[in-house]
């Protein structure tokens, strides 16, 4: 069992941390691209006072969550699951329950190496199911909307 833990700590975790940081960084960049294009590509820029006011409103409302969520969710989700969950979103309603259900089904403890791997699998499945359902909904919704008269 120590060889498995060694592989987990020396190979799996560094790999997941490296790609987790990369994908989160790319996600942040992708989230900023529309605003950058509007500002620099089309010259559409709100006044600085409006930007500062809206930023302060969002940060003051969300700041506690920036600290509380990673601290409270990470032991259950594991390091790889935390990266995946924060990138895909909807942690408390979808990712966390799927993680807990996967760990219970596999009869592993959260906070262990086994729990982290099972949690990652559960979260990955929830993301794939979520994307599948959204894709079907968008396709069906588009076909319904196209049949509605203008």
Which residues make up each language-model segment?
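Short, structured coil/loop segments at alpha-helix boundaries
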Residues: 1, 9-10, 77, 81, ...
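Short hydrophobic/aromatic-rich motifs at helix boundaries and adjacent loops
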Residues: 40-45, 54-56, 70-78, 112-117
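Selected alpha-helical membrane-embedding segments in polytopic membrane proteins
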Residues: 55-105
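Helix-loop-helix junctions within the multi-pass membrane cores of secondary transporters/permeases
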Residues: 88-150
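Generic alpha-helical transmembrane segments of integral inner-membrane proteins
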Residues: 29-32, 36, 63, 67-68, ...
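Generic detector of intrinsically disordered, low-complexity, polar/charged segments
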Residues: 17, 24, 75-78, 119
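Signature of multi-pass transmembrane helix bundles
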Residues: 1-56, 125, 136, 140-150
């Amino acid at each position: 069992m120590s060889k498995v833990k060694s592989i987990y700590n020396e190979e799996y975790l560094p790999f997941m941390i490296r790609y987790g940081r990369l994908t989160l960084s790319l996600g942040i960049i992708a989230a900023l691209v529309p605003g950058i294009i509007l500002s620099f590509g089309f010259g559409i820029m709100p006044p600085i006072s409006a930007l500062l006011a809206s930023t302060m409103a969002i940060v003051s409302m969300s700041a506690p969550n920036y600290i509380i969520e990673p601290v409270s969710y990470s032991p259950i989700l594991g390091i790889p699951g935390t990266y995946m969950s924060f990138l895909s979103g909807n942690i408390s309603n979808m990712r966390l329950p799927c993680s807990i259900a996967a760990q219970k089904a596999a009869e592993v403890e959260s906070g262990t190496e086994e729990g982290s791997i099972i949690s990652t699998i559960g979260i990955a499945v929830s993301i794939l199911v979520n994307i599948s359902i959204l894709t079907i909904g968008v396709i069906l919704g588009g076909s319904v909307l196209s049949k509605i008269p203008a």
